[in-house]
Curated annotation (Swiss-Prot):
The lineage of its organism: Eukaryota, Viridiplantae, Streptophyta, Embryophyta, Tracheophyta. Part of the 50S ribosomal subunit. One of its GO terms (biological process) is translation. GO terms for cellular component: chloroplast; cytosolic large ribosomal subunit. Keywords: Chloroplast, Plastid, Ribonucleoprotein, Ribosomal protein, RNA-binding, rRNA-binding. It is found in: Plastid, Chloroplast. This is Large ribosomal subunit protein uL23cz. It comes from Sorghum bicolor. The gene is rpl23-A. Belongs to the universal ribosomal protein uL23 family. The keyword rRNA-binding applies. Its main location: plastid.
Length: 96
């Protein structure tokens, strides 16, 4: 399984959810909740209690006379067990 998580999201809502031990990520749109749950548990070594997701729409873009749009993407809110500390880097890698 490839890395499904694109990046962590830091909005007002996601920062408020950090107090509830919930973390927000944008993920590849083809991944399911169970795949992301298993990937987070394996890669970060934490216990995931729940995974909520929603699909965000693409936005219209214009370059001169050409109309286009950006791709849609999926956002997942991952709830961890209470008392678990979460680091945004994997436990088995070196961070410099």
């Amino acid at each position: 399984m490839d890395n499904g998580i694109k990046y962590a999201v830091f909005t007002e809502k996601s920062l408020r959810l950090l107090g509830k031990n919930q973390y927000t990520f944008n993920v590849e749109s083809g991944f399911t909740k169970t795949e992301i749950k298993h990937w987070v548990e394996l890669f970060f070594g934490v216990k995931v209690v729940a995974v909520n997701s929603h699909r965000l729409p693409g936005k219209g873009r214009r370059m001169g006379p050409i109309l286009g749009h950006t791709m849609h993407y999926r956002r997942m809110i991952i709830t961890l067990q209470l008392g678990i500390l979460f680091h945004f880097y994997p436990l088995n890698s070196r961070v410099f």
